[in-house]
A protein has these predicted regions:
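Post-signal-peptide, soluble extracytosolic/periplasmic N-terminal scaffold domains
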Residues: 23, 27, 31-279, 584-658
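Short, ordered, surface-exposed loop/turn motifs in non-cytosolic proteins
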Residues: 60-83, 293, 683-693, 762-777
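Feature captures outer-membrane beta-barrel proteins of Gram-negative bacteria and organelles
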Residues: 162-164, 192-204, 226-239, 376-398, ...
């Protein structure tokens, strides 16, 4: 079998050929055309040379060509079919008004172009301030234009004209969990659960459904199972008004009012469609797990986030910034113990840039999760924020029904510059609860946020709210109307967070405090204090220590926890740790653990934990965990055993599956709010994509997950690790996808073997230098003829038929079969077709 030449050798060969050509050029680099001095070519027949395709700089023959385009050094995520026309005996690129619009030129420039069209397009270099450069090797056109002639000034944002809604397709994003708990005495228990999202895309429309499934067993016998579809909805972006339209079962999205589940229609301005601005706020959820635990964050009984965490402090920092209202947090320990509390996800001061308006509106009927209709009236809700002055925003909203509930709110937000930012609003409710008279109530809310640049401190006083006894939220009205009596009439609530990093001490401090009081129930206060510091001990660098104290108050029960941890790096990918924990019973336990992530796709840990008596009696809990990352998903396994007490096993797998008319593939997990991109490698298997985040399957299909929306993203092929006998021409793809899109691109893949040979004509001579060798079957160029007929051909199939054309002459080559190839240079007879 003929061995594939190394890419470095190929690159050097090509570079040497083109470097040789470059020294033949006579004239300055800025000239529009050059000639090659054939006398400088060391060839037996200098006249037998055809370099016409190298003789013009920045020009192509008259015609239409598909190219990549750069505007002011920024790559556009589309290919353009650009036309070259003849002007003053030279060819020049010519753009249609539609192409100028796609590239972001202003209406004034487009109007000038429309008045000076040539064959339906405008030669843009007629404008002296516009210059172009054509890279023929990459077929890439660079355009330089004054920034004032472009609509969009932010180089990090892509205009709507270049957004890609993707292709039609379907997907399933899934998370699977399984657990087995076996006490030394008593019944065994098992649990299987799953949650995720399924979707279908058609044009700009996206159909989505959330699902969550849970089944419990006792000694292998099914005890209970539950399958819910919390939301089924249709949505699409509307770029013309920078908004998102949603139809179906959804949750209201509000920075003023509590969120509730409904069936209907909503329209919300999407700030991600705008140049960078305030991006909202999402809370950080912290806690301490006593064992291997499952942390679940939900809202309105819909799972938002779920993760397995090891014993010790944990922090969830990657919640979506669209979350508003109360979030329910549940920590399920492996021994069955459950801890619950609530976290308020309130927005920071509601500020909008001067002259801009942000809004959201919805109408329909409230429903329970799963879609069951409630005894509720039709409602309409809406809110807005308007940038009145440079540092002042006005905002407000309302919730209106056709029966016994109305609510109005108004507020103002201030950017106080060096003093931080502040907002204040008042909400009025008019409601008639069951068997009560109609009452009017008021709620007052304030938010404050300040970052102290000189000290690196961040203070957030989010969501201070005081409500009088007669104030009723929409959620409380829904519960009362449907005779749900387990809700509490909130009186006062607030959240305070403070973060400080002292660089000189390498010390970080984090404090959070949340307090809720009620008119008809006892109050609860949750707070946590965390101190962490890095330092060096002899040869051990970046030893980290942390001390965490937290109190969780839930249903008149206080749970205090204190946790101390020391982690010592062992090389670059291993860690030895010790932890000490005191729980609400004042029992102190110790944990020693070892973590190894030396393999980027495989990590594991072992630990032993227990109190002094358990270690003394050899009854400490022994734990082990293993995580395996693949291109198709992530596997997590863990187990715990305690002598004469219990053992438990846990497993989880998350991944995704995407299918389109071009093919289908399993791939790594892609979040429901993210887009994804399908790569078609024309049947080539094991093509590494985006630093091996994905690979193509046996059908040549790969999917890159979690591609950001409304942001220009470059996706790449790892050309250094291509399979044998495969080369990729377009190894970098640039795209800007809309929310939830399935992007698609087909790679220019050359599959087949390589030949290093010498082309010989019937009379013993060679074809001219610079002639292209093309595969007649697939219409692709496979190489260029060098001096003495030497050629490197790449991507040859057993049925390939190669052709060469120069002037009025042509010939064809029947390459040797791959099974008959030998190492070294191959003689390739080229049979004349004249």
């Amino acid at each position: 079998m003929y061995k594939k030449l190394k890419l470095t050798t190929i690159s050097e060969l090509i570079k040497n050929i083109y470097c040789s050509l470059s020294v033949l050029i006579i004239g300055c680099a800025s000239a529009y055309a050059v000639e090659f001095n054939k006398d400088l070519i060391e060839a037996e027949d200098r006249e037998n040379v055809n370099l016409s395709q190298f003789e013009t700089d920045g020009q192509l023959p008259v015609g239409k060509y598909s190219l990549n385009a750069l505007i002011n050094n920024k790559r556009t995520p589309i290919h353009l079919d650009l036309q070259w026309v003849l002007i003053d005996n030279q060819t020049a690129v010519c753009l249609t008004p539609e192409q100028l619009t796609l590239l972001g030129f202003t209406d004034e420039i487009i109007e000038v172009a429309q008045q000076n069209l040539i064959d339906g397009c405008y030669p843009i270099e007629k404008e002296k301030q516009i210059t172009t450069y054509l890279d023929k090797g990459k077929m890439q056109l660079s355009i330089s234009a004054p920034q004032a002639w472009l609509k969009y000034k932010d180089a990090n944002w892509t205009p709507p004209e270049l957004w890609d809604h993707g292709i039609a397709g379907a997907f399933l994003d899934y998370n699977l969990y399984a657990s087995h708990y076996a006490p030394h005495q008593g019944d065994n228990s098992q649990n299987i659960s799953s949650y995720g999202q399924a979707g279908v895309n058609l044009g700009a429309w996206r159909l989505r459904t959330d699902y969550q499934y849970d089944q419990s067993f006792n000694n292998g016998k099914s005890q209970a199972n539950n399958l819910d579809f919390p939301r089924i909805y249709l949505f699409r972006p509307i770029p013309a008004i920078n908004a998102k339209l949603t139809i179906g079962q959804y949750d209201t999205e509000s920075s003023i009012f509590d969120s509730f589940h409904f069936s209907g229609v909503s329209l919300k301005s999407d700030e991600n469609m705008l140049p960078p601005d305030l991006r909202g706020y999402a809370p950080q959820i912290t806690g301490v797990a006593q064992t291997n635990a499952k942390v679940t964050v939900s809202q309105n009984n819909r799972i938002i986030y779920q993760e397995n965490v090891p014993p010790g402090p944990f922090a969830i920092t990657n919640l979506f910034n669209t979350l508003q209202g109360q979030l329910d947090v549940k920590v399920e320990e492996e021994d069955g113990q459950v801890t619950q509390w609530q976290v308020a996800s309130n927005s920071i001061p509601y500020l909008t840039r001067k002259g801009q308006i942000r809004y959201t509106t919805a109408m329909g009927k409230p429903t329970s999760v799963g879609g069951d209709s409630l005894q509720q009236p039709f409602f309409w809700t809406g809110e807005f924020s308007w940038g009145w002055l440079n540092n002042v925003s006005l905002y407000g909203g309302s919730v209106l029904t056709n029966r016994d509930y109305q609510s109005l709110a108004a507020g103002v937000g201030f950017n106080l510059n060096s003093l931080g930012s502040l907002s204040f609003d008042v909400t009025r409710s008019d409601a008639q609860l069951h068997n009560q008279d109609k009452e009017t109530g008021y709620s007052y809310r304030a938010n404050y946020s300040k970052r102290f640049e000189s000290t690196g401190s961040q203070l957030t006083f989010a969501g201070y709210r005081f409500s009088d006894k007669n104030f009723v939220t929409m959620n409380e009205y829904i519960n009362d109307t449907n005779h749900y009596t387990n809700y509490q009439n909130e009186k006062e609530s607030y959240i305070v967070t403070f973060n400080q990093y002292l660089e000189s001490l390498r010390l970080n401090t984090y404090v959070s405090l949340a307090r809720n009081t009620y008119w008809d129930a006892s109050s609860n206060v949750n707070y946590s204090l965390s101190l962490s510091r890095d330092f060096d001990i002899g040869p051990s660098k970046n030893v980290s220590t942390s001390l965490t104290f937290s109190r969780i108050n839930w249903e008149e029960d206080n749970q205090d926890q204190l946790y101390l941890n020391i982690s010592i790096p062992w090389g670059t990918s291993r860690t030895l740790s010790y932890g000490m924990q005191r729980n609400q019973d004042n029992k102190i336990s110790h944990t020693a653990s070892w973590y190894d992530s030396s393999d980027r796709n495989n990590s594991w840990s072992v630990s032993a934990s227990g109190d002094n008596d358990e270690f003394k009696d050899m009854k400490a809990s022994l734990r082990a965990s293993y995580q395996h990352n693949t291109e198709n998903g992530r596997l997590y396994l863990s187990g715990t055993s305690q002598r004469d007490s219990y053992y438990s096993l846990n497993a989880s797998w998350n991944g995704s599956f995407t299918a389109t008319r071009h093919g289908a593939a399993f791939h790594d997990y892609s979040g429901s709010a993210d887009s994804r991109f399908m790569i078609d490698a024309d049947g080539a298997e094991d093509i590494p994509l985006n630093n091996k985040r994905a690979v193509t399957n046996r059908y040549g299909i790969g999917v890159i997950p979690s591609v950001s929306s409304y942001i220009t993203t470059s996706l790449s092929v790892d050309t250094r690790n291509l399979p044998e006998n495969v080369d990729i021409e377009n190894s970098v793809i640039t795209t800007t996808l809309t929310e939830g899109a399935i992007g698609y691109a087909k790679l220019d893949t050359r599959k087949g073997y390589q030949i290093m040979g010498v082309i010989r004509l019937a009379d013993g001579s060679h074809p001219p230098l610079g002639i292209s060798v093309k595969d007649k079957t697939i219409h692709k160029e496979l190489g260029l003829v060098a001096d003495g007929g030497f050629v490197y051909l790449n991507g040859i199939q057993d049925d390939s038929k190669l052709t060469l054309r120069w002037g009025d002459k042509s010939c064809f080559i029947q390459p040797p079969n791959s099974s008959n190839l030998t190492t070294g240079t191959v003689i390739l007879p080229c049979i004349s077709q004249n």
